[in-house]
Structure formats: structure tokens, C-alpha cells
């Protein structure tokens, strides 16, 4: 049985999917995983399909060196973003796999949330490129392992009326009120 990094509180309400040695860039995929973590399943799938169609972008926060700016990243309070098509397609495949695992386990698909996404760098694959003066340089690829866990969450019940706290006044205003009260 495959070992996962995620230890759920209730294993009966979790479904998992995992893929190893995917030939897709590690850095792009880790940013994609970070973007969909915490989303509902249907929202994550529509978001990733929008990224493939260039309607929304993936915000780049950690691996952002040399990444260009785009206006769509403003929605995520950052300036840098990209549209990693291949990473999104691999994530969509894993989400589809996890969804079918959830149906098999009898979980409610409408209440599934992406609880855990882990992207790890796999062993690099080596090729070569030929340079001037008879030199040879490495031409490496950066594949990755992806694991994904969906958790069935309860419906959120809205809270009742909350009493609004009295607005805090500054010391200057309080002093002024005391002066007015004395007169």
C-alpha cells in the first residue's frame, strides 16, 4: 500500500490519489498544487480548466525568479503568474482519479475539499546538448511526484447574530468627554 504524508483525523472520509515520476516541471506543479489547496473539488476543477484556457492564472509565490507579471495575478494579491498548462492537466487527471475513488468509497462528491497536495521532486533525467568547440552540456528534466487527498467536509452552518462590540475610543476623546461632562 502506498504511503502518504497526510494523516487524516477520520480516514473513512478521505480519498487519495497519487502519481510518481510525472514528466512535468516540479516548480510549476508545486505552485499549481499550492493554488488549489483548500478549494472544493468542483471549484478546483473549473479553476484548473480556466488556467488551461488562459482565463485565470496560477500565482507564483515561491519559485518566482524570472516569472513575468500578469494582470490576472492581482486577484491573488501578487504580481507574478503563469499558465502552466501541462501541470494543470496532470492535476486535473489526479482530481478525476480521486473523485472516482471517492465515489467508490461512497463519499459525497459535492462536499469534497482538497485537503492535502504534496509535490516532490523526482530523480532528474539526463540528456545532453552539444555546444561550440566540441563541448557537451547537461540537458536535465525535473520530473515530480504528486499526491493529493480530498476530504469530505460538513456543510458550514452560518452563525447566529453576534453582538457588536462597543467601538474603542482613544484616550484623547475620553479626556475630552470628561471635560465636557464636568462642565
UniProtKB/Swiss-Prot annotation:
Highest taxon above the source species: Eukaryota
An annotated Gene Ontology molecular function: structural constituent of ribosome
Keywords: Ribonucleoprotein, Ribosomal protein
Stretches with biased composition (Basic residues): 165-183
Membrane-crossing residue ranges in chain numbering: none
Pfam families noted in UniProt: Ribosomal_L22
GO biological process: cytoplasmic translation
Gene Ontology CC terms: cytosolic large ribosomal subunit
Region (Disordered): 163-183
Family: Belongs to the universal ribosomal protein uL22 family.
NCBIfam families, per the entry: uL22_arch_euk
Protein name stated in the entry: Large ribosomal subunit protein uL22
Amino acid at each position: 500500500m502506498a504511503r502518504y504524508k497526510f494523516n487524516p483525523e477520520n480516514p473513512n472520509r478521505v480519498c487519495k490519489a497519487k502519481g510518481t515520476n510525472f514528466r512535468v516541471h516540479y516548480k510549476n506543479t508545486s505552485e499549481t498544487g499550492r493554488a488549489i489547496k483548500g478549494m472544493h473539488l468542483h471549484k478546483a476543477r473549473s479553476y484548473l480548466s480556466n488556467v488551461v484556457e488562459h482565463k485565470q492564472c496560477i500565482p507564483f509565490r515561491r519559485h518566482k525568479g524570472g516569472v513575468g507579471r500578469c494582470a490576472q495575478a492581482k486577484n491573488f494579491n501578487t504580481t507574478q503568474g503563469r499558465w502552466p498548462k501541462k501541470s494543470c492537466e496532470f492535476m486535473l487527471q489526479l482530481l478525476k482519479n480521486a473523485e472516482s475513488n471517492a465515489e467508490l468509497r461512497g463519499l459525497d462528491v459535492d462536499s469534497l475539499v482538497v485537503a492535502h497536495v504534496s509535490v516532490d521532486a523526482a530523480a532528474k533525467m539526463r540528456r545532453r546538448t552539444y555546444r561550440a568547440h566540441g563541448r557537451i552540456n547537461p540537458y536535465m528534466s525535473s520530473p515530480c511526484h504528486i499526491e493529493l487527498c480530498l476530504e469530505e467536509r460538513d456543510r458550514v452552518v452560518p452563525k447566529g447574530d453576534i453582538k457588536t462590540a462597543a467601538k474603542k475610543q482613544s484616550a484623547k476623546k475620553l479626556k475630552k468627554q470628561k471635560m465636557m461632562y464636568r462642565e
